Every structure is written in structure tokens, then in C-alpha cells.
Amino acid sequence: MTAQKLDGTATAAAIKGELTTRVAALHERGIRPGLGTILVGDDPGSRWYVNGKHKDCAEVGIESIRIDLPATATQDEIEDAVRVLNDDPACTGYIVQLPLPKGRDENRVLGLIDPAKDADGLHPTNLGWLVLGKAAPLPCTPNGIVELLRRHGVEIAGAEVTVVGRGVTVGRPLGLLLTRRSENATVTLCHTGTRDLAAHVRGADIVVAAAGVPGIVTGAMVKPGAAVLDVGVSRVDGKLAGDVAPEVWDVARWVSPNPGGVGPMTRAMLLSNIVAMAEQTDS
């Protein structure tokens, strides 16, 4: 068996086409959605991610608002930038690019974001609404995973899902999304401290690997015909490596490549959050 590809690049392109139409309709009503970013320092990876987000905005007609601060920016200066975007009517929503330089209080900065402008869907208030099942901006990567599965016809309702990784950006909120009544999956959350990871993975119809441990999910662990999504990012000998070993492609029915799988979907869901926020202001 050679797995079919869960093609995040093509799926994200289709979503951006849909968003372009929705943004054009907003423009006709005099509403111009705007995405803001706060970047502190000059880390090449962070700058690449931010540049990509603004490129995506240009493709669908969303305005860009950038605040770039030096690595020497103080905690107060970063918090002031957050307040600027909170108060800017041209900014529909925004993100603070992480990580911040050492010595800065990331949780305090993120807590200052206006929850209504939380484009990443990771503000404590919005995560709380997710727990309660109320409408709020959704975390981009988990939402992208669900959308990628849905658009490829992978059955989620009733599926046994094993999530490997307990991070706040993927593992923990993904379980909340997948157990909503609209998805109705049964989720097992594993991590690097799980005693018998193979047993949990082997029983899963869907596996999401997001531990940041290269090759933690092997072909021997995976049930034939499962869907496997590789979300982990780490480096081995200076090269990017995912959490899913190559031989998984010979066992699974569906595999998301890394790169080209969940990453493009994360960016597409960020745009989707901005457009949804703008549409709510028009309602």
C-alpha cells in the first residue's frame, strides 16, 4: 500500500480562493479586513513566517499591518505594540509571532490581546469558549487539521484518534475540536511520557503526530489504512524533520507530507479567522 497524500498546499489554495470571494463581498460593503503582526527581533524563521502571512493577505485582498520591533525591545514596548493593535480600527485581528526574545513574558503579552482580535485563537478566553462549545476564533493548526481531513473525505465521526503531543498550539486544543458534536471523534492524547505509545497509535484510525520528536511515529506502530498527519518540526543534522517516519507511507491510507501538509492549512485558517471576524462586524 502506498498512502495517498493529504495535500495541504492544494487544499489551502482552494480555501484562499473561497476567501478571496468573501473578502471581495466585504469590500463591496465598505469593509476592509486587516491582519496585524508583531515581530520582535530578526530571527530568520520568524521573519519568514511573518512575510508568508502578509503574502497570503495580499493574495486574498486582506490589508497588512506590520509592527516590527528590535530584539532589544523591552516588555513595556512589546505590550505597547499590543495596545496599538487593540485600538486600531483598521486591524481586524492580529498575531504576536513567537517565540519572543529571552526574558520577555510571553503569557503576559498574549493575555493582553483583545480576545475579539485574537487571530491565532489561542487567547485564554477563546480557549475557554472552545471548552464551553461557544463560537470564538479557533486555533489555526488544529482547525487546519480538521479541515484537511474533512476536505479529503476522511471519516472523523466515530473515529478513534490518537494525538501525540500536548502543546497548547496543537495537541491540547485539537482534542477539544475533535470531540465537538460536529466531529464526534474519540480522542486519546499521548505525549513523550506515554508508557506504551505504540499501543495507542496502533488502535487509531487517525494519528496526529505533533511532539517535535523526529520519527516518533513509525510504520510498525500504524494500523493499515489509517490517516496519519505529520505536524512535528525539528532539526536533524541541520535539516528539517517531521515526527512521522518514511515507512508510514507504506502502511497508511492517508499521510500529510511535511512540509506541504498541515503548514499551509495553518496559514489558510489564520486568514479564515480574519475574514470571519470581519463578517461578524458587518452582521
UniProtKB/Swiss-Prot annotation:
Species of origin: Nocardioides sp. (strain ATCC BAA-499 / JS614)
One cellular component term from this protein's GO annotations in UniProt: cytosol
Known role: Catalyzes the oxidation of 5,10-methylenetetrahydrofolate to 5,10-methenyltetrahydrofolate and then the hydrolysis of 5,10-methenyltetrahydrofolate to 10-formyltetrahydrofolate.
Superkingdom assignment: Bacteria
Gene3D superfamilies hit by this protein: Leucine Dehydrogenase, chain A, domain 1, NAD(P)-binding Rossmann-like Domain
Designated name of the protein: Bifunctional protein FolD 2
UniProt-annotated binding residues for NADP(+): 165-167, 192, 233
Pathways involved: One-carbon metabolism; tetrahydrofolate interconversion
Enzyme Commission identifier(s): 1.5.1.5, 3.5.4.9
Keyword DNA-binding included in the entry's annotation: no
Keywords recorded for this protein, A-Z: Amino-acid biosynthesis, Histidine biosynthesis, Hydrolase, Methionine biosynthesis, Multifunctional enzyme, NADP, One-carbon metabolism, Oxidoreductase, Purine biosynthesis
Protein family membership: Belongs to the tetrahydrofolate dehydrogenase/cyclohydrolase family.
NCBIfam families found in the cross-reference section: PRK14193.1
Keyword Hydrolase appears in the UniProt entry: yes
Subunit structure, as described in the record: Homodimer.
Biological process terms in GO annotation: L-histidine biosynthetic process; methionine biosynthetic process; purine nucleotide biosynthetic process; tetrahydrofolate interconversion
GO molecular function, one term: methenyltetrahydrofolate cyclohydrolase activity
SUPFAM superfamilies listed in its UniProt record: Aminoacid dehydrogenase-like, N-terminal domain (SSF53223), NAD(P)-binding Rossmann-fold domains (SSF51735)
Catalytic activity field: (6R)-5,10-methylene-5,6,7,8-tetrahydrofolate + NADP(+) = (6R)-5,10-methenyltetrahydrofolate + NADPH; (6R)-5,10-methenyltetrahydrofolate + H2O = (6R)-10-formyltetrahydrofolate + H(+)
